Amino acid sequence: ALDTIAEPMWLYAQADLLATQHRYPAARGKLDSLITTWPGHPLEDEVLMQLAQMALAENDVDTAMVMLQEIVSLHFDDILADDALFQLADLHQNWLNDADAALPLYEQLLFEFPGSLHAIEARRRFRALRGDDTEL
């Protein structure tokens, strides 16, 4: 019998290689299969992040935002949650030019993930969007 723990890892590794090769449809198929076959698997946030990155590479901002929001909503305690939140805020700010939507996302990152690698940049952007005098 196959080791059911190793199989999702193998499938994810194959999808990651395909994504690195810019073979997005094939990678997406493997990732979708992983989510369908093993719902709730610990790799699910990595799968969603990979799907978001591929969507961004194809300029599909709407799909990327859905994937990132799903990570923030369902995997808020996982290692990629702060990355997803920062990317989501960045998309609102820089792709959609929607500072009003980006501001609370940066604030959420600062309060929920104060130790994040993104905290310094999120604080800088939050203050700039809020209109604070940053020349002090």
Q: Predicted regions span which residues?
A:
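Acidic, polar-rich low-complexity tracts and alpha-helical solenoid repeat scaffolds
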Residues: 1-136
